């Protein structure tokens, strides 16, 4: 097992500890966006979260929830399965189109909100 060392404290590390409901991706997403503004790191993270693919946000919440009971090798296996599934579905090429090809930064996601994502669709990534 690898045991990492913690980073020295810095201005961006001084973020209060928040606890999130990882059982519900939509609720977790809303809790993250409700974190008060003011810290540049938190503000940038919230901007990225709100402008990114809702399915990816939901996947990340589910992935974190599952990873707490897994080892490193199992986490990498889960990551590979998720990535393999994501490239089969329309949101990945849509994100590439909007960011890299047309550069319009106006993706049309499969689901416009995390709360719209059916649980079965989310779980199909795992």
Feature map (PLM): residue ranges:
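C-terminal alpha-helix plus adjacent terminal tail
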Residues: 1-126
């Amino acid at each position: 097992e690898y045991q990492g060392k913690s980073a020295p404290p810095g201005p961006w590390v001084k973020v209060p500890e928040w606890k999130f409901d990882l059982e519900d991706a939509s609720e977790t997403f809303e809790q993250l966006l409700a974190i008060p503004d003011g810290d540049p790191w938190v503000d940038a993270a919230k901007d990225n979260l709100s402008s990114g693919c809702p399915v990816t946000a939901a996947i990340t919440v589910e992935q974190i929830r599952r990873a707490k009971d897994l080892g490193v090798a199992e986490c990498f296996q889960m990551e590979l399965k998720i990535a393999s599934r994501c490239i089969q579905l329309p949101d990945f090429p849509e994100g590439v189109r909007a960011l890299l090809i047309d550069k319009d930064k106006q993706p049309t996601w499969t689901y416009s909100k995390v709360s719209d994502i059916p649980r079965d669709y989310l779980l199909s990534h795992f």
